[in-house]
Swiss-Prot record:
Keywords from the UniProt entry: Acyltransferase, Amino-acid biosynthesis, Cytoplasm, Methionine biosynthesis, Transferase
Gene Ontology biological process terms in this record: L-methionine biosynthetic process from homoserine via O-succinyl-L-homoserine and cystathionine
Molecular-function GO terms, alphabetical: homoserine O-acetyltransferase activity; homoserine O-succinyltransferase activity
Catalytic residues identified in the record: 142 (acyl-thioester intermediate), 235 (proton acceptor), 237
NCBIfam families attached to this UniProt entry: metA
Entries under CDD domains matching the protein: GATase1_HTS
Pathway as given in its UniProt record: Amino-acid biosynthesis; L-methionine biosynthesis via de novo pathway; O-acetyl-L-homoserine from L-homoserine: step 1/1
Keyword Lyase: no
Gene source species: Novosphingobium aromaticivorans (strain ATCC 700278 / DSM 12444 / CCUG 56034 / CIP 105152 / NBRC 16084 / F199)
Entry's family note: Belongs to the MetA family.
Name of the protein described by the UniProt record: Homoserine O-acetyltransferase
Length: 301
């Protein structure tokens, strides 16, 4: 089934060119089914790229998905035009009375700042609390995952001596988990972060389980059933050249490992994680669909 996004959202042209089926509101209304309602709280500076990456993965699932773009109410984006934000994003204050099958919380370039010093931390805490009553399942990504674990469980993040950047081999520790269905025993995942959450800091008795990790970069994916949340520290949504773009932005300071052939930044990297991203997001959407109430009003009851 296709994904429904605004007709003039820039991601639409990109996805249609890739063969992803994108549905108009009129076409969606003709289908006598309830679509999955997914909110994307996009904290990334380059919002258009992140919108496209997430929509690509959700649009490949076998369900009709309505993707709604949400922003922090009292934060002004410096890297995405005000026109784009105004046209396509709703502030959280405007949607807080509504209910969603799923919520995706992205990362943000604030990893080196204490949580309480992030300008929108108070609102993000309210959003995390709101997700427990108004959202059926949540997927938190990178800094969003660290922030959620800190908010819900008091787990601190730790700064890294240098940026963890590259494509790393990860171990699937729970192949029978519905989140990991179809993923191989070992699989590649792009990593790009300055901080980490450590296994030894995970509290006992909270039901947290490690689904995947890497010998080189640590924890990758944690299931948090009590909060109905999947915490993903890395980036299966990344495009083939996302890490290359970050390397150029950082002026060549942090060469991504296991990425450029022969460590030559002029060489074209191979995307070895695309299928893994589709599997994980497909599993998340499918499990959300299987367990969410048919009536959105029943979410949180």
């Amino acid at each position: 089934m296709p994904i429904r996004i605004a007709d003039n959202l820039p991601a639409r042209r990109t996805l249609e060119a890739e063969g992803v089926i994108v549905m108009s509101e009129t076409e969606a209304a003709r289908q006598d089914i309830r679509p999955m309602r997914i909110a994307l709280l996009n904290l990334m500076p380059d919002k258009i790229t992140t919108e496209t990456q997430i929509a690509r993965l959700l649009g490949a699932t076998p369900l009709q998905v309505d993707l709604e773009l949400v922003r922090i109410s009292d934060h002004v984006s410096k890297n995405t035009s005000a026109g784009h934000i105004s046209a396509f994003y709703r502030p959280w204050d405007d949607v807080r009375a509504e209910k969603y099958d799923g919520l995706i919380v992205t990362g943000a370039p604030v990893e080196t700042i204490p949580y309480e010093e992030v300008s929108y931390w108070d609102e993000l805490r309210r959003i995390f609390d709101w997700s427990q009553s108004n959202v059926h399942r949540t997927l938190s990504v990178c800094w969003g995952a660290m922030a959620a674990l800190y908010h819900f469980h008091g787990i601190e993040k730790h700064g890294l001596p240098t940026k963890a950047s590259g494509v790393f081999r990860h171990v699937n520790h729970a192949p029978a988990s519905p989140w990991m269905r179809g993923l191989p025993d070992v699989f590649d995942v792009p990593v790009s972060r300055w901080s980490e959450v450590r296994r030894e800091d995970l509290p006992e008795g909270r039901g947290l389980s490690v689904l995947a990790d890497s010998a080189e970069t640590g924890l990758c994916l944690i299931d948090d059933p009590a909060m109905r949340t999947l915490h993903m520290f890395n980036h299966l949504e990344y495009d083939t050249l996302t890490l290359a773009g970050e390397y150029a932005r950082d002026e060549g300071k942090y060469l991504p490992r296991n990425y450029f052939p022969g460590d030559d930044p002029q060489a074209m990297p191979a995307n070895t994680w695309r299928g893994h991203g589709h599997l994980l997001y497909g599993n998340w959407i499918n499990e959300t669909y299987q367990t969410t109430p048919y009536d959105l009003a029943d979410i949180g009851r």
